[in-house]
Amino acid sequence: MRGSPGDAERRQRWGRLFEELDSNKDGRVDVHELRQGLARLGGGNPDPGAQQGISSEGDADPDGGLDLEEFSRYLQEREQRLLLMFHSLDRNQDGHIDVSEIQQSFRALGISISLEQAEKILHSMDRDGTMTIDWQEWRDHFLLHSLENVEDVLYFWKHSTVLDIGECLTVPDEFSKQEKLTGMWWKQLVAGAVAGAVSRTGTAPLDRLKVFMQVHASKTNRLNILGGLRSMVLEGGIRSLWRGNGINVLKIAPESAIKFMAYEQIKRAILGQQETLHVQERFVAGSLAGATAQTIIYPMEVLKTRLTLRRTGQYKGLLDCARRILEREGPRAFYRGYLPNVLGIIPYAGIDLAVYETLKNWWLQQYSHDSADPGILVLLACGTISSTCGQIASYPLALVRTRMQAQASIEGGPQLSMLGLLRHILSQEGMRGLYRGIAPNFMKVIPAVSISYVVYENMKQALGVTSR
């Protein structure tokens, strides 16, 4: 077979690809040239893990690059693996992958995608406009991406079109059976928890300012952003801007773990005989999981608010704060504001999910002519906008919750129920009163998302989670 016409054609094609990648014409392709080639030929942001994997796998003598012989040997093995993947996805063995076969393959992995999403995926590889993918199109699209099996290919597609971020991740992440079996799921949860801790610490002054304005700002006490920061610094110094951050970080781990376990159980109950959850069912499961987690860790939310608002020397620490609340107000105090908190999950989760899906599908319709991958900036922008819309809808309930958590610690203040507090705010301050502190809340969204993303990606790399 070595001298066959097909073999000669392949070697010519590999030679042309090698020449195109070898930008400095030194007879070798290094990681830098490979990175440029992946970006140029793949039509999207290349995966650093794929570049390193290709170099280490193909380089027989580890000298930092591939010569033509090593490059050709790698591509030959690569094409053989890709051909097996192609046949695995081509369920009716007609030599083409169509939209229904893409959907079936996703369903087999427990991932539900719409017909429109499947068409967008197919369109990103379909060069001849036939709305099917033949072997040549498949090979050319995936030749330089380090994808080892069908699950990897499907997750390359999934992660290029789906990213769901929210302020508190009200609807938990979906993990495939493969991710659960390999242990990638807990590594991603750990990476997310560390990212959340760093992000919350970085934006803690704005978070404390928000709580401060929610509780203390009014028509008679017109607190603005600078005035609020100044009064906090004058009362307790620069370090006081981070009051309440310790418990805010501490509650990430139990909340994430409980939410994930509850979501898996609720999802199993909803699924029944179905293979996958629809978006509406995912919203219901996510909201119930969020409510379950909040029910269990809610005393930590009350402690966070009290510690955030404390005066210098008021409490010796977390345990002292909890002991004093228990002695003076009883155990019920640890669930003050619970009802508006749980009710706030529904508008936040629903609007966050709906706006994100709308923005994502709009972008895919308008701009995904050559690729279904919008890039990380577009995905982060969609996530930020959807999260902000969710916050606007649920903010009045969040404000009422915070006031109820804090009102027992304010001397001479009225002890009101949720409806009583809503009526009091509306009668005294109007609708604007329900949005006190929303400015610093908006100010922290972009830095929080940015810090979270950077730390999350670095943590995934450190933990050995493959990015696709």
Curated annotation (Swiss-Prot):
Activated by an increase in cytosolic calcium levels that induce a conformational change of the N-terminal regulatory domain, uncapping the channel and allowing transport. Inhibited by bathophenanthroline, mersalyl, p-hydroxymercuribenzoate, bromcresol purple, tannic acid, pyridoxal 5'-phosphate and p-hydroxymercuribenzoate. Gene3D superfamilies: EF-hand, Mitochondrial carrier domain. Residues 58-67 have a biased composition (Acidic residues). The keyword Calcium applies. Residues 207-243, 301-336, 398-436 are mitochondrial matrix. Residues 150-159 are annotated as: Linker region. GO terms for molecular function: adenine nucleotide transmembrane transporter activity; ADP:phosphate antiporter activity; ATP transmembrane transporter activity; ATP:phosphate antiporter activity; calcium ion binding. Residues 1-149 are annotated as: Regulatory N-terminal domain. It is a multi-pass membrane protein. The keyword Transmembrane applies. Solcar repeats lie at residues 183-269, 277-362, 374-462. GO terms for biological process: adenine nucleotide transport; ADP transport; ATP transport; calcium import into the mitochondrion; cellular response to calcium ion; mitochondrial ATP transmembrane transport; mitochondrial calcium ion transmembrane transport; positive regulation of mitochondrial calcium ion concentration. Expressed at low levels in most tissues examined, with highest expression in brain, skeletal muscle and pancreas. GO terms for cellular component: mitochondrial inner membrane; mitochondrion. It holds the Pfam family EF-hand_7. Its main location: mitochondrion. Residues 165-468 are annotated as: C-terminal transmembrane transporter domain. It comes from Homo sapiens. Interacts with MCU. Interacts with MICU1. It is found in: Mitochondrion inner membrane. Keywords: Antiport, Calcium, Membrane, Metal-binding, Mitochondrion, Mitochondrion inner membrane, Repeat, Transmembrane, Transmembrane helix, Transport. SUPFAM superfamilies: EF-hand, Mitochondrial carrier. This is Mitochondrial adenyl nucleotide antiporter SLC25A23. Electroneutral antiporter that mediates the transport of adenine nucleotides through the inner mitochondrial membrane. Originally identified as an ATP-magnesium/inorganic phosphate antiporter, it also acts as a broad specificity adenyl nucleotide antiporter. By regulating the mitochondrial matrix adenine nucleotide pool could adapt to changing cellular energetic demands and indirectly regulate adenine nucleotide-dependent metabolic pathways. Also acts as a regulator of mitochondrial calcium uptake and can probably transport trace amounts of other divalent metal cations in complex with ATP. Ca(2+) 1 binds at residues 22, 24, 26, 28, 33. Residues 34-67 are annotated as: Disordered. Residues 9-44, 77-112, 113-148 form the EF-hand domain.
